[in-house]
């Protein structure tokens, strides 16, 4: 497919509006109430050159259908039938179109991951039964939700599955996901094609299409909007000919599947077809090396990448106690200390007698991903535990490890393949520990061959050449180094070693470990598993990166050691964590502001209680809580923190407010409140993700928020404002079809004798549109706080 073009359709919503879609009407129900209209629209697109039409099933999910007399299956089957009717006599095919569920998944929201998978599976089952030719998952902004939809599609069908996500002007999705993280995660999970749709026009998205074509081997899809909407009339500003002209550059970048999204119609698809028909997609310079990620943190394995070893109960009594007690906050503290010290990947091992690893490993993974954004390496040989953890992991993880025994390969590699993980191959087999480098290399080759047979690319196989204790097997150190050299230089693979094993049983272990580490890195060790809290070890890594050319212009080295102040700060930090945390007192977070910023609910509550011994409740709010939230908000605006961090800080702030409320109640005092705000998603719009985020953040700045919900009539908003004497109202709209409802709500509020200030936001709202209505423009939750401060103080 990369060598020929495939033409998709344009917007369904745009066409339905043209044909009189009423405000508040559910578009998906037209499959039952007016199927001929849908067939006519599909046929217009086919006549314009479309080869694959998207059935009118974008929002046909359980959540949206629950207030209608129809089931998901009723709507999906009718929509696909209408599309298939349009294809009669042509070669066009029908895609089951699956959009977002309209609710944030845990931990950012309240929707459990498996519930989301089940909701998507219901749509997939209906689409398969109705005869869909392929599945197109689109307009996703949360990589976790895209994963849930893709898993449902792969587990409930054998149809091809395409996935597109929506990226904004920052080059990230609404939740902070990057292009490489999206590409490698979805590719690993088995998507057949990936791309971008909606959010912006082709000119704005062109750099992102170019980036995507460089980082994935899959066919790339482009379905951009017809430019940007006019703030007054909602019409998109890019004519069909200009749209098509820019799409020539998109195809030139290597995109092979093209269509349009919001604002496009058959005229756009016809112009697109005329402009690029007969073109061959541009040659793609694909860089596809070893890679791990979380949504916000892509990590290419090029050069040395440090794996932190401390999340492991072996020999750590306090850690063992935490596991047995289910004290995940302690484990998070251990993780934070390692990341702060420079770990780029965290090894996660929870295997201990009395611990249910199948239940505990996914719990720890979820907890860690709430707080740290580095990729995880799941350390277990328990296939059930690994599957449970990989299923809930958001991004591309590594599995540590599989050995060369055939049974282990047959058991673990299918799990690795299904979830698109990388895997550490341990160079031993049923015969035991190999004595020579040649034997280890031979096992490594068998592991790679087996992985490739299961469809795991060789760049996703990392080889552990085994570090044995030098005090007991002195000759084995050289064999290990020789194996590392061959595996990395001759086989071209990433290499792993548990470095600290070398010094077990010796005095001055640090010196021996550090020396062996440097020798191993020089031979080709790229993924050392070490204790990053040991300053001398990390200093050795920093120096090696300079000498190997990885640290260009010595920039990181100079930053680490370039000033006396930096050296003093580093020594102070190292003294605090040089031995792994053994008690809560050694936790990484020791002040309230830091706990809020990091989103640590339990630590924030504990530190708030301690602070109340010397400060009053108002002081906690003004000196700690608000400055901490402001810091996260500023980082969010600068693009160095993202939605997960913003919501994590808000949740930690909620924990602090609970402590403050309890303290005031015990004294008989009044709650800390800064003013009341009404918020609502306007009539006809059932999307409330953005509104809910705004509510959470406002509440944690001390504002009392009355949330009227979604699909709220103007009269309901006005009644609440009058009854509660509200001075600030927040309105949200996600769809252009509901902008008239927003305008009407604002108009009615302005007619009140003492009208409130109004702030508006949502994906389709612009600053000009807000100004024309006489409202503040709140581009995000952070902006809503600044408006509230201006209006209410």
Where are these regions (language model features)?
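Domain-level signal for soluble alpha/beta catalytic cores
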Residues: 1-793
């Amino acid at each position: 497919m990369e060598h020929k073009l495939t033409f998709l359709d344009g917007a369904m919503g745009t066409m339905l509006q043209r044909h009189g879609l009423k405000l508040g009407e559910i578009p998906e129900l037209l499959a039952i109430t007016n199927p001929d209209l849908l067939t006519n629209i599909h046929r217009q697109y086919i006549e314009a050159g479309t080869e694959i039409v998207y059935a009118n099933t974008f929002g046909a999910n359980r959540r949206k259908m629950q207030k209608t007399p129809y089931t998901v299956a009723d709507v999906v089957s009718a929509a696909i039938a209408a599309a298939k009717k349009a294809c009669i006599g042509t070669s066009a095919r029908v895609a089951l179109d699956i959009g977002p569920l309209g609710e944030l998944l845990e931990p950012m929201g309240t929707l459990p991951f498996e519930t989301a998978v089940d909701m998507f599976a219901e749509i997939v089952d209906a689409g398969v039964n109705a005869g869909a030719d392929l599945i197109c998952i689109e307009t996703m902004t949360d990589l976790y939700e895209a994963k849930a939809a893709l898993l449902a599609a792969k587990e409930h069908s054998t149809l091809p599955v395409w996935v597109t996500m929506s990226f904004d002007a920052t080059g990230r999705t609404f939740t902070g996901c990057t292009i490489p993280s999206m590409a490698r995660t979805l590719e690993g999970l088995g998507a057949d094609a990936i791309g971008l749709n909606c959010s912006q026009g082709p000119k704005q998205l062109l750099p992102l299409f170019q980036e995507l074509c460089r980082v994935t081997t899959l066919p790339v899809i482009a379905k951009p909007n017809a430019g940007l909407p006019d703030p007054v009339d909602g019409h998109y500003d890019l004519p069909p000919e200009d749209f098509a002209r820019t799409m020539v550059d998109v195809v030139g970048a290597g995109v092979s599947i093209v269509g349009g999204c919001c604002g496009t119609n058959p005229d756009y698809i016809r112009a697109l077809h005329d402009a690029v028909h007969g073109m061959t997609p541009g040659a793609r310079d694909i860089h596809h090396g070893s890679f791990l990620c979380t949504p916000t943190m892509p990590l290419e394995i090029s050069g040395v990448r440090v794996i932190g070893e401390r999340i492991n109960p072996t020999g750590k009594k306090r850690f063992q106690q935490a596991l047995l007690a289910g004290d995940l906050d302690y484990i998070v503290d251990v993780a934070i200390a390692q990341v702060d010290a420079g770990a780029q990947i965290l090894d996660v091992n929870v295997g201990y007698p009395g611990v249910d690893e199948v239940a505990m490993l996914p719990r720890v993974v979820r907890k860690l991903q709430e707080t740290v954004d580095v990729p995880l390496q799941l350390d277990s040989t328990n296939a059930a535990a690994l599957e449970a953890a990989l299923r809930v992991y958001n991004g591309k993880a590594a599995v540590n490890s599989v050995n060369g025994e055939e049974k282990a390969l047959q058991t673990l590699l299918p799990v690795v393949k299904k979830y698109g993980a990388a895997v550490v191959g341990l160079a031993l087999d049923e015969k035991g520990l190999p004595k020579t480098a040649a034997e280890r290399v031979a096992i490594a080759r068998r592991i790679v061959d087996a992985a490739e047979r299961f469809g795991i690319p060789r760049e996703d196989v990392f080889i552990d050449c085994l570090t044995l204790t030098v005090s007991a097997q002195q000759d084995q150190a050289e064999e290990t180094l020789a194996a590392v050299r061959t595996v990395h230089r001759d086989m071209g693979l990433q290499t792993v070693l548990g470095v600290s094993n070398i010094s077990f049983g010796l005095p001055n272990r640090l010196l021996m470990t550090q020396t062996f580490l440097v020798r191993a890195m020089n031979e080709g060790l790229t993924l050392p598993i070490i204790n990053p809290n040991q300053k001398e070890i990390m200093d050795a890594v920093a120096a090696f990166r300079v000498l190997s050319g990885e640290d260009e212009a010595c920039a990181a080295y100079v930053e680490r050691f370039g000033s006396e102040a930096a050296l003093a700060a580093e020594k102070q930090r190292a003294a605090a964590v040089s031995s792994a945390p053994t008690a809560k007192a050694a936790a990484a977070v020791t002040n309230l502001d830091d706990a809020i910023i990091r989103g640590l609910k339990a630590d924030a509550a504990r530190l708030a209680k301690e602070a109340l011994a010397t400060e009053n409740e108002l002081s906690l709010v003004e000196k700690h809580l608000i400055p901490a939230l402001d810091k996260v908000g500023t980082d969010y605006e600068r693009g160095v923190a993202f939605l997960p961090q913003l919501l994590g800080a808000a949740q930690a702030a909620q924990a602090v407010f609970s402590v403050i409320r309890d303290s005031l109640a015990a004294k008989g005092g009044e709650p800390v409140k800064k003013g009341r705000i009404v918020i609502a998603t306007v009539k006809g719009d059932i999307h409330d993700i953005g509104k809910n985020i705004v509510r959470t953040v406002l509440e944690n700045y001390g504002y009392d928020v009355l949330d009227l919900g979604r699909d709220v009539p103007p009269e309901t908003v006005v009644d609440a404002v009058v009854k509660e004497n509200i001075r600030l109202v927040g309105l949200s709209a996600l769809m252009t079809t509901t902008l008239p409802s927003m305008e009407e709500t604002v108009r009615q509020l302005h007619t009140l004798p003492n009208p409130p200030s109004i702030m508006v936001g949502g994906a389709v709202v612009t600053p000009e549109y807000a100004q024309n209505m006489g409202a503040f423009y709140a581009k995000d939750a952070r902006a809503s706080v600044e408006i509230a401060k201006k209006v209410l103080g």
